[in-house]
Amino acid sequence: MTIIDQLNTALSGIVLHLPYLLTILGWTWALHVVNVFFGYRLCMFGIIPRFPTGLVGIFIAPFLHGNFNHIFMNSFFFLGLGSFVILQGEQVFNVVSIAIIVIAGLLTWLFARRAAHVGASSVIMGYWSFLMVRAYYHPDIIDLLAAALGLYYFGVHMAASLVSHEKGVSVEGHVFGFLAGAVTGAFYPAIAMWVLAGADKLGLYLGG
């Protein structure tokens, strides 16, 4: 298969899976509208480090955002990097997303400063590092292109976010998300077995 053929296949795959990503994004925006209606009080359900109830926020925090700029920027990056991750298949996308959410969320709960941590930035950072690790282990043209484009278009913003001191920005979430994505990429087979086994026990279907 030529490079052009691979690129055409990738583009077709992105278009095919775009409705799935837009559905996730749609529910995230719907939740944000509800959050705005309640004066952003839903953010209290984010990850609150070292509070037992804050553990629930691990699965809720990625869908909560502190303002419209926050959710708008994350929506853009989610579609960009998520499109490359989902090229591996919806099951891989779901496994990677869950692994990043759980690993980054637990690390944030254990080690982050005491505050309500919300936003999809940790997941997006995880997608970026996952793609880079995958490109290292499986250097085909699509994975290399995904990592390169992620680095070029998103790298400056995300690298800056790692050391950001902006109020309301969860620096720890960015760092732990990046680490979670790298770990998921490096140990994907083992992590996939763990995630799929857990999903099976809960009766969840993550795609074939």
Over which residues does each language-model region extend?
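A detector for small-residue-rich transmembrane helices and their helix-helix packing motifs
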Residues: T2-G208
